[in-house]
């Protein structure tokens, strides 16, 4: 797996690879879904930690990124990915399959995954995210 600054290139890939494996989407399209999901995870963490200002800031940045991806006709949500998947499945089954695929990720470290978390344009941190937290987010994300 990548180490050091190369890890920043994993932004969008942790969830994106799970989406790619399950949906059959092209790599870039799946990473677009993962990128938007990563912004959502950061926003959720900020708000659950009581930092609504940080949540609002990251949501504004996510809207900018979302607008660019939408202009490129890329899928933006897990539901978008499910609807374009090569095999029809229920929303819950699709999300559980994505979670299962994510647990095989090379960035997994026991009960955590090293995750590239966007903090703003050009600002990404690498942090461990618990698999349970990640699974909970995937189950509830748009």
Indicate where each model-derived feature is located.
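C-terminal charged capping/lid subdomain of soluble metabolic enzymes
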Residues: 48, 52, 56-142
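Residue-level signal for inorganic ion chemistry
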Residues: 13, 35, 121
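Gly/Ser/Thr-rich beta-alpha loop segments that engage phosphate groups in nucleotides
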Residues: 14, 18, 30, 124
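An active-site-proximal "capping" alpha-helix that borders the catalytic cofactor pocket
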Residues: 28-42, 65-71
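Active-site metal-coordination segments of metallo-dependent hydrolases
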Residues: 5, 23-31, 55-59
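Residue-level detector of well-ordered alpha-helical segments, enriched
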Residues: 4-7, 11, 31-34, 61, ...
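Oxyanion-binding "anion nests"
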Residues: 1-24
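Active-site catalytic microenvironments for nucleophilic, acid-base chemistry
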Residues: 18-22, 38-45
């Amino acid at each position: 797996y990548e180490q050091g600054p190369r890890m920043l290139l994993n932004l969008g890939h942790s969830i994106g690879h799970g989406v790619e494996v399950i949906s059959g989407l092209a790599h870039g399209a799946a990473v677009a879904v993962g990128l938007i999901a990563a912004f959502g995870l950061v926003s959720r963490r900020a708000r659950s930690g009581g930092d609504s200002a940080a949540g609002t800031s990251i949501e504004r940045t996510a809207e900018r990124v979302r607008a660019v991806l939408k202009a490129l006709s890329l899928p933006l949500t897990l539901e978008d990915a499910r609807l374009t998947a090569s095999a029809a499945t229920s929303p819950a089954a699709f999300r559980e399959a994505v979670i299962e695929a994510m647990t095989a990720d090379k960035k997994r470290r026991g009960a955590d995954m090293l995750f590239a978390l966007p903090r703003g344009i050009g600002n990404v941190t690498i942090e461990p995210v618990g698999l349970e937290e990640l699974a909970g987010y995937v189950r509830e994300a748009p």
